[in-house]
Amino acid sequence: MDFTEAYSDTCSTVGLAAREGNVKILRKLLKKGRSVDVADNRGWMPIHEAAYHNAVECLQMLIHTDSSENYIKAKTFEGFCALHLAVSQGHWKITQILLEAGADPNETTLEETTPLFLAVESGRIDVLKLLLQHGANVNGSHSMSGWNSLHQASFQGNAETIRLLLKQGADRECQDDFGITPLFVAAQYGKLESMSILISSGANVNCQALDKATPLFIAAQEGHTKCVELLLSSGADPDLYCNEDNWQLPIHAAAQMGHTETLDLLIPRTNRACDTGPDKVSPVYSAVFGGREECLEMLLQNGYSPDAQMCLVFGFSSPLCMAFQKDCDFSGIVNILLKYGAQLNELHLAYCLKYEKFSMFCSFLKKGSLMVPWNHTSEFISYAVKAQTKYKAWLPHLLLAGFDPLILLCSSSWVDSASDDILIFTLEFSNWKRLPSAVEKMLSVRANSSWALQQHLASVPSLTHLCRLEIRASLKAEHLHSDIFIHQLPLPRSLQNYLLYEEVLRMNEILEPAANQDGETSKAT
């Protein structure tokens, strides 16, 4: 049954008269002996109707008819007594009548809400004072989840109410079921004046909720810069860890949520142990996780490392690896990290293949991702295998950049899954007559079912091809990042093109690497 909507056909005539404040009709009904305790579909009796609708005379008549404690304290199906309803609407006179008739100022609803809490919620300071005069308790739980009236006043930013409650002895450090204090609530909702009053009264600026979050952390998370400023000037500790794993700080919250002004306040005040320290998490990760380019650049400009530390919490070896996990376009994040010197490795190439960012893959090759020691070769190969169907978009670039084709050819997963065209193309970057025995064995097995591969393996590499391999092997790795260096060699253009495998690319109907780019390139370089 719906306890929030009043059905008129369930309300008694006495209840309707009280609801409408019709004293004349109510008097007639009472003289006829009509009952005053008939409830409607919500459990509302006439006394509830009169209290809610501010029908003072009707209420007095009802109490005169039945002044018993049971009637005065009768509750609706939601646990509201007449006092709750009167206070919720800010009816001072009704509240006074009920209190003098014996209503309990500390009675709770089914949701554990007290009249004092409802008075704070309604913003009626006069009703609040009336309840306090009649013994309302300012401490303890006043609503579900353990919120106290001081929590609610802090949430609403009602300075007069906060001062009154504190004056009456309200505990400034009272906690709800989650360990949250009124100061935390004020910080969360940006109530600067509430915070100022609470701090002036001695509230602990470094209090922590059950999840270890502090007022400074929540203010930073919500971007309440003035609140952050007040907390810092009042002694809040920006290095107090705000989670069980002892790594999360206010600076992380600001960076993740994109609050640049707040971040600007926290950067110079936060200890740099979080930057690259072991078992910590750099706020650079937080900025990347939130996709906050401006915050990321701010951190890097202020000296935070673009490589941070290996992040076991998120399962990434670097912020650049994390960037690939974003659902949105992450090229801007990648650009910023590279701008400030992020180190590239094979994992980043692997993620380019995983997410089919082939132009970014080519850009990473040009930036020297093949020059660093490889520690994740198996992971790279696994993604390379999955990207075989689109090999023309990335494999030529990889091999032309100096990648050793034997790394692929030594992998059974690559050889077993690759088409004949892919295997033959890969072999073109090697001396296929001098392959390791294990590779020869795998390829011979494949060749048994492939005439084209069998024919290629049986052929003898030309002298010009072997010379090409030797010349390319003699070049420094950085000279193979692009075709610029080779085009500058004192050789005929035809030989330059030969060193760049132009005839192999043409035979395989592959666009020249310089032309095989799309709109993604400009974003990735």
From Swiss-Prot:
Pfam families from the UniProt entry: Ank, Ank_2, SOCS_box
Species of provenance: Mus musculus
Keyword Repeat: yes
Binding partners and assembly: Interacts with ELOB and TNFRSF1B.
Keywords tagged on the record: ANK repeat, Cytoplasm, Repeat, Ubl conjugation pathway
Tissue expression as described in the entry: Widely expressed; highest expression in testis and spleen.
Broad class of the protein's primary localization: cytoplasm
UniProt domain SOCS box: residue ranges: 442-505
Protein name from the UniProt record: Ankyrin repeat and SOCS box protein 3
Family the UniProt entry places it in: Belongs to the ankyrin SOCS box (ASB) family.
Tagged with keyword Cytoplasm: yes
Pathway field: Protein modification; protein ubiquitination
PANTHER family assigned: ANK_REP_REGION DOMAIN-CONTAINING PROTEIN-RELATED (PTHR24161), PALMITOYLTRANSFERASE HIP14 (PTHR24161:SF85)
